[in-house]
Regions:
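Conserved AMP-binding
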Residues: 118-123, 242-244
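Adenylate-forming
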Residues: 11-26, 169-185, 221-233, 247, ...
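Conserved A3 ("GATE") glycine/threonine-rich loop of ANL adenylate-forming enzymes
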Residues: 167, 242-249, 261-269
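Structural core segment of the AMP-binding/adenylate-forming
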Residues: 1-50
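Conserved AMP-binding/adenylation subdomain of ANL enzymes
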Residues: 95-114, 121-224, 234, 259
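Conserved pre-ATP/AMP-binding loop-to-beta segment of ANL
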Residues: 32, 53-76, 83, 108-114
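Conserved AMP-binding A3 loop
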Residues: 72-98
Length: 269
């Protein structure tokens, strides 16, 4: 792609990248998001904070016009045999993906949402759902410090949309059930009734009677509200992608009044 500038997030990746970059004639400048130890003078390495401190006239900078078919990024596939393969995505392919994603919400357009991003941005799923989609809908992106602090960060920022992989939802599902199983028999029975009524509401609305609605409402005050707090106080829905979400997990959250939207696609598209 003949890139002349590279952005590197941390020192660990810098050490890997610089081994190849020192022998690459195209790369002239490297901007790092952490201070790194680089004493050679082969490349110009700049810590991003140093750029912000300079009071230069930003009008000097200009952006070249791009065509839809120009390369926008290269994402390396995971889970394939042999070495990872670099997939070149054009501006057109990313925009088409965004148009399709935004069209899903045509009845309730996304605007000024609050996303929390914690998946690797080197994956096409998070590239779209966690980065480009928020930007395209004038929304905010909050980046989690790390996976261990994810739920602390969720409480801090109260996202309206959370994008994750099935594995996370499976872990939450198991944790909720384990906590319920530690309760007395009455609580366990009430929770099962709550799930059953939620499932009926989701799958068979015709047989969802008025009495069911009343019981479900009362039980939701006991269970649903507490469970929803795991995801903050402003959650609208969850997004699942990067793998298949089992029906069991999906219906579990839907039964608790937590909407999960499922996405799918290939890195190559």
């Amino acid at each position: 792609c003949n890139a002349k500038l590279a952005f590197i997030s941390n020192e660990r990746l810098f050490k890997i990248f610089i081994q190849a970059a020192d022998n690459n004639k195209n790369i002239k400048n490297i901007i790092t998001f952490e201070k790194v130890n680089y004493k050679k003078k082969i490349k110009k390495v700049t810590y991003i904070e140093e750029i912000f401190k300079k009071k230069e006239n930003t009008n000097k900078f200009s952006i070249d016009k791009k065509n839809n078919d120009d390369e926008a990024c290269i994402i390396y596939t995971s889970g394939t045999s042999g070495k990872p393969k670099g997939v070149v995505l054009t501006h057109k392919s990313i925009l088409a993906n965004l148009e399709g994603s935004i069209d899903v919400f045509n009845k309730s357009p996304l605007k000024n949402e609050r996303f929390i991003s914690f998946l690797p941005l080197s994956h096409s799923y998070e590239h779209t759902a966690g980065q480009f989609l928020p930007v395209a809908t004038s929304s905010q992106i909050f980046y989690a410090e790390n996976l261990e602090k994810l739920f602390i960060n969720i409480k801090e920022v109260n996202p309206t949309i959370i994008s994750a992989v099935p594995r996370l939802y499976e872990a939450i599902y198991k944790k909720i059930l384990n906590n319920i199983f530690k309760k007395n028999n009455l609580i366990q029975k009430l929770f099962k009734i709550n799930l059953k009524l939620g499932k009926t509401k989701y799958e068979d609305k015709k047989n969802y009677r008025l009495s069911d609605k009343i019981i479900k409402f009362l039980l939701s005050l006991i269970f649903d509200k507490k469970i929803k707090k795991i995801f903050g106080s402003k959650l609208k829905f969850l997004i699942s992608g990067g793998g298949a979400l089992s029906y069991e997990i999906n219906i579990f959250f839907e039964s608790l009044g937590i909407k999960i939207l499922q996405g799918y696609g290939l890195t190559e598209t």
